[in-house]
Design a protein with these regions (language model features):
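Generic structural motif recognizing short loop/turn segments at the entrances and edges of beta-strands
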Residues: 1-2, 31
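Short His/Asp/Glu-rich catalytic/ion-coordination signatures at enzyme active sites or charged loops
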Residues: 2-8
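Long, internal low-complexity/basic segments
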Residues: 8-230
Length: 230
C-alpha cells in the first residue's frame, strides 16, 4: 500500500478548508494550544507566570484567529505573496513561526523570495522562531554560507542547557530532516551536546537522548528500491 498525500490536490481544497475550520472550532472550544510549538508554549507560560491552561484562555497571548492568519498561508496555491512577508514580521512569535513553516511547506521559490526576512529570524527573540527559520534556510539555502549559518543556529538550540529540553528536540528534529550528506559532518558535534535540561523534570528530558541515538543510527535518505526525489 502507498499513502497518497491529498493536501496539495486542488480537487480536495474545499474539503481541506472545511476540515481545518472544524479543527479550529474545536481548538477554540477546548482551549487547545496546538497552534503553539511546545518550546514556545512553555516560554510564554513562564514569561507571563501562567499555567498552559491559563495561557490558552488569554487572547492577547494566544489568539487562534490571529494565528490562523499565518498558519493558513500554506493553503495558498500561489505561494502566499505579501501575506508571508507580513507574517514573517508579525507581532506574535507564533505568527512568525507559522509563516516560516509556510515557506518550508511551499518550497524553494517562496523561501528564496523571503530569504532576507527569514535570515533576520535566525536572531529572533523566540527560539521556536529561530529553529523554524533555520530549518527553512538549511533546507532551501541560497548559498553554502547561508546554509551553514542556519545549521549553526540549529546546533546552538540543540543544546538543552542553552535553550531548553523542548527547543533542543525541535532543533534536533530539524537537523535530522537534513540529508545525510549534509548532516554527517556535524554528527560528532551533536553527539557531544548535553542531553538533559536541569530545569525540566521527568519525561521531556528523555527526548533529546533518543534523538541523539536516532541521528547516530539513521534511516537512510533512500532505500535501494527507491528513486531519489520520489
Amino acid at each position: 500500500h502507498e499513502t497518497r498525500n491529498l493536501a496539495k490536490d486542488v480537487t480536495f481544497a474545499n474539503t481541506l478548508k472545511t476540515m481545518r475550520n472544524a479543527l479550529y472550532q474545536n481548538l477554540e472550544k477546548t482551549f487547545d494550544v496546538a497552534l503553539l510549538p511546545e518550546g514556545l508554549l512553555h516560554d510564554l507560560a513562564s514569561q507571563h507566570n501562567l499555567t498552559p491552561a491559563d495561557l490558552a484562555r488569554d487572547k492577547s497571548l494566544y489568539s487562534i484567529k490571529k494565528l490562523r492568519s499565518a498558519s493558513d498561508i500554506l493553503l495558498d496555491p500561489n505561494g502566499g505573496g505579501e501575506r508571508v512577508a507580513n507574517m514573517l514580521r508579525a507581532e506574535l512569535p507564533a505568527q512568525r513561526y507559522w509563516a516560516a513553516l509556510a515557506c518550508l511547506y511551499l518550497g524553494k521559490e517562496v523561501t528564496h523570495n523571503h530569504e532576507e526576512a527569514l535570515s533576520s529570524l535566525l536572531k529572533d527573540p523566540s527560539r521556536s522562531v529561530q529553529i523554524a527559520a533555520a530549518e527553512v534556510l538549511a533546507t532551501f539555502p541560497i548559498n553554502k554560507l547561508g546554509a551553514n549559518a542556519a545549521l549553526e543556529v540549529l546546533l546552538a538550540n540543540a543544546d538543552p542547557t542553552i535553550s531548553s529540553a523542548y527547543h533542543a528536540v525541535a532543533a534536533l528534529n530539524a537537523l535530522d530532516h537534513q540529508p545525510q550528506q549534509i548532516l554527517e559532518p556535524y554528527k560528532q558535534r551533536i553527539a557531544r551536546l548535553p542531553t538533559n535540561d536541569p530545569d525540566v523534570p521527568g519525561r521531556p528530558n528523555g527526548y533529546a537522548a533518543r534523538m541523539h541515538k536516532h541521528i547516530a543510527s539513521p534511516v537512510p535518505d533512500y532505500f535501494s528500491w527507491e528513486k531519489p526525489g520520489r
